[in-house]
């Protein structure tokens, strides 16, 4: 029996073995007898005692409509490093049901709670055991998880000069993600990451400590060390591993955005490459890439949320047309416009860049007005707006992105495009159900060479 007549959300969460977020949602829905004092929910203990009679978390969730109403035969997924849930939405469009999300960023958590108030949401993956995660997801003993997906950050492997290798694996969220996934042993594991994962060393040696007359790089300092390490762990658990660097434009996304997708299968058989739905010039009989014009022209009569360019930058944008960048300025203005950056190496194609109408968008970044990665509207004197980001990333119109303006840009700029997630989900379901997966020999999945498991490891993976 609970001693106090009124208890807090935290106390109720502990008694019910639910997350505080879940308890607050139940308060809002009237599933628990509670009232608000200011911004704080106060809960009648008698209501909690009734809930405590329910034997399991799963039963409690069902009793109070805390589970989504999708059919129970959908394959089940758990999501980590969920962000704004771009990967999740694509996977769900393929036919999966996401039971749990994990995110530490406050704005992204608010986005998840706003759109999926009934979904289990946890914070830092390192704060939970496998048992905690399964319980919060409502997975009862004997029930399988079909898919675990996420994009763990790989920076932890190679923080310049300050990391201790992998002596403290508990502090590494990438390692924790693998530990959780391999402990749960779903049918499939998906790892999404940036291109840098393919070349990231286990330990970074500063550039001023390399070169002629200095000791050669150790094995853990060699490019690709992180990838080799990940694959070794996954394969030792009996999973197959296949991966490639995929340009999202090849999957119906109006954006040139390349991401590494690693797919691991518990049955040990290699999952083929994703099946493209589009190609740059219509190769393989596929439709051509979707352009920016096709994507954002219907957004003209809405209110756009966007950051502003500095006035001194607008001076140059007034001289540039769609698809142009700093090199299209008169020669006498190029040095003036770029300042010290003019003398840097590389093409500097992100400086003073107006995106083109009849191409997919360049990769959306977390801030469209940073000098080296400008994303200016093709015609207007402004960066691309949050609303334009959202449709380029293919989020549904009803999907709410929470937070301040820069929070929204960050969430959308970090998201996996829905079309790429859909391609991943379809491939996994086809493999799971024994359906033939069409191959596209010599298809150019990205702008780079030697980016797949077959390129790097041959048939051994």
UniProtKB/Swiss-Prot annotation:
Keyword terms: DNA-binding, Methyltransferase, Restriction system, S-adenosyl-L-methionine, Transferase
Signal peptide start and end residues: none
Main enzyme class: transferase
The protein's Enzyme Commission number: 2.1.1.37
Protein species of origin: Salmonella infantis
Family affiliation: Belongs to the class I-like SAM-binding methyltransferase superfamily. C5-methyltransferase family.
NCBIfam families in alphabetical order: dcm (TIGR00675), excise (TIGR01764)
Organism phylogeny: Bacteria, Pseudomonadati, Pseudomonadota, Gammaproteobacteria, Enterobacterales
GO BP, sorted A to Z: DNA restriction-modification system; methylation; negative regulation of gene expression via chromosomal CpG island methylation
Domain of life: Bacteria
Reaction equation(s) it catalyzes: a 2'-deoxycytidine in DNA + S-adenosyl-L-methionine = a 5-methyl-2'-deoxycytidine in DNA + S-adenosyl-L-homocysteine + H(+)
GO MF term set: DNA (cytosine-5-)-methyltransferase activity; DNA binding
Active site: 154
Residues covered by the SAM-dependent MTase C5-type domain: 75-435
Pfam families membership: DNA_methylase, HTH_17
InterPro entries: C5-Methyltransferase (IPR050390), C5_DNA_meth_AS (IPR018117), C5_MeTfrase (IPR001525), C5_meth_CS (IPR031303), HTH_17 (IPR041657), SAM-dependent_MTases_sf (IPR029063), SinI_DNA-bd (IPR010093)
Protein name (Swiss-Prot/TrEMBL): Type II methyltransferase M.SinI
